[in-house]
Amino acid sequence: MRVGLIDVDSHNFPNLCLMKLSEYHTRRGDRVEWWDPAKQYDLVYKSRVFTDTYSKDTIQVNNADKVIQGGTGYGPGENLPHEIEHIRPDYFLYPRFLGTAYGFLSRGCPRNCGFCIVSGKEGRRSVRVADLSEFWNGEEEIKLMDPNLLACPDHERLIEQLIESRALVDFTQGLDIRLISRDNVSLLNKVRTKAVHFAWDNPDEDLTEYFRRFRELTSIKSDRNRRVYVLTNYGSTHEQDLYRVNTLRALGYDPYVMIYECPTAPRITRHLQRWVNNKRIFHSVSDFKDYAPMKKEV
């Protein structure tokens, strides 16, 4: 069987689903490759993480007996079969990322935030779904994709697995700052951490003291490795957005502005995102009102 794969997003991050499908079919003896419109396939998989706002699917497949599409970008759908979900990913599918392992130790989140699909898709409890050995086999770096690791009752044992690996770990999706404790930070301090991500999504919830406490307890020395997603254009005012950005910087964190439904965002929010996320500008222009595009509009 010839199997074609399509990464609809084509962004700078490997598609974990496609890597698992590639490994599964390769083990079955199937021929697996990136889809080529000039060839004929028995089966083609299209996978998309992002919705039309950020990643439009314009790819028409007319050269396959069967086409299966899936991923959060297409809306609710079936999960991967157990034997595929828990297979070690084929990291050779993305050669430029070799040396890095990608996966989930836990799934689900109790927060049920309106802008996030995780609670509806994975459940409102964070549960352990794998051990590290399922997707890591000595790679130098681990990209952990758990939506709310600290909400998982087994999170301490899972963190211990990361410690034992001695790999460089990037907590990519955001640890819950509200669940930080002296005990779990003590464990996190033993992880070889490349970066830790948090989120300050709700402007009506003042998380200042939580961030201050983590800063006092953590062994991560560089503010550029203590990163915080700041959600905007989801019921917040510009003043609330700017307050969170400035507060995080003052506390020793590196904010990163995320815009909900970017096409509907006001111009000032898009300017804020460019100012904050372009770190060369952010570190050289300390006040948003001094950012050049804003000065032109005053």
Which positions does each model-derived feature cover?
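Ser/Thr/Gly-rich flexible loops in soluble cytosolic domains mediating phosphotransfer, phosphorylation
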Residues: D65-L93
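Anion (oxyanion) recognition and catalysis
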Residues: T26, I163, N246-A250
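A general structural detector for well-ordered alpha-helical segments in enzyme core domains, enriched
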Residues: L21, K56-N63, L158, D183-L187, ...
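A short, structured N-terminal alpha-helical element that caps or precedes a catalytic domain
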Residues: M1-Q69, G75
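Canonical Radical SAM [4Fe-4S] cluster-binding loop centered on the CxxxCxxC motif
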Residues: L16-C17, R96-S133
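A structural motif corresponding to the C-terminal lobe/cap of the Radical SAM core domain
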Residues: K190, A195-H197, D204-V298
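Core AdoMet radical
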Residues: L5, S10, Y45-V49, I117-F214, ...
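A short helix->loop->beta-strand "cap" motif at the edges of active sites that frequently abuts
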Residues: N62-G70, S222-R224, Y253
